[in-house]
């Protein structure tokens, strides 16, 4: 039986990152974690490109443009949607997650979901580098593994 696995080596890979500017205090921590993970696994800073989207809702379109360009081995999507008093949270989080998944399937490029969807600011802070780790770091590690897995399967 042949088994395919993606290695956690980012040398010679190129990554696009789409970050939503809304809740930038949280997203900037996710971004730092993602860049840290890429660099720790061998990626040069010149092989990372960042696009700032106005908010989480706009992330799928920008990630699609990046994925379709063919310039990237993977695209990492980072954002923070925090529940408020209205149903807006439900609509935004649902559409962002669907859009990111559809982009990955449509383009064949790994497009990684690193968008926090939390009930409150405390949960977002916990997931942006405190007691629950940094989900931006985790998303970047997933991007590295998926980029290598796609290359391995294609060989």
From Swiss-Prot:
Report the Pfam families cross-referenced here: DMRL_synthase (PF00885)
Any one Gene Ontology MF annotation carried by this entry is:
6,7-dimethyl-8-ribityllumazine synthase activity
Active site, renumbered: 88
Q: Which GO BP terms sit in this record?
A: riboflavin biosynthetic process
User: In which residues is (2S)-2-hydroxy-3-oxobutyl phosphate bound?
Assistant: 85-86, 127
Q: What is its EC number?
A: 2.5.1.78
Q: Which reaction does it catalyse?
A: (2S)-2-hydroxy-3-oxobutyl phosphate + 5-amino-6-(D-ribitylamino)uracil = 6,7-dimethyl-8-(1-D-ribityl)lumazine + phosphate + 2 H2O + H(+)
InterPro entries, alphabetized? LS, LS/RS, LS/RS_sf
* SUPFAM superfamilies for the chain: Lumazine synthase
Q: Which GO cellular component does the record give, naming just one? A: riboflavin synthase complex
* Record keyword Transferase present: yes
Leading EC class: transferase
Function of the protein: Catalyzes the formation of 6,7-dimethyl-8-ribityllumazine by condensation of 5-amino-6-(D-ribitylamino)uracil with 3,4-dihydroxy-2-butanone 4-phosphate. This is the penultimate step in the biosynthesis of riboflavin.
Stated name of the protein: 6,7-dimethyl-8-ribityllumazine synthase
Q: Which organism is it from?
A: Clostridium acetobutylicum (strain ATCC 824 / DSM 792 / JCM 1419 / IAM 19013 / LMG 5710 / NBRC 13948 / NRRL B-527 / VKM B-1787 / 2291 / W)
What is the gene called? ribH
């Amino acid at each position: 039986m042949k088994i395919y696995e993606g290695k956690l080596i980012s040398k010679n890979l190129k990554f696009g990152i789409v970050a939503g500017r809304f809740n930038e205090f949280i997203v900037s921590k996710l971004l730092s974690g993602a860049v840290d993970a890429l660099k720790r696994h061998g990626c040069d800073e010149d092989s990372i490109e960042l696009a700032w989207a106005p908010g989480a809702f706009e992330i799928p379109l920008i990630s699609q443009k990046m994925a379709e360009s063919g310039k990237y081995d993977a695209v990492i999507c980072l954002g923070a949607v925090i529940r408020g008093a209205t149903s807006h949270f439900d609509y935004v989080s649902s559409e962002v997650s669907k859009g990111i998944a559809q982009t990955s399937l449509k383009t064949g490029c790994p497009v990684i979901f690193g968008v926090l969807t939390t009930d409150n600011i405390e949960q977002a802070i916990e997931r942006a580098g405190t007691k629950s780790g940094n989900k931006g770091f985790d998303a970047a590690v997933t991007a590295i593994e998926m980029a290598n897995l796609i290359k391995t399967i294609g060989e």
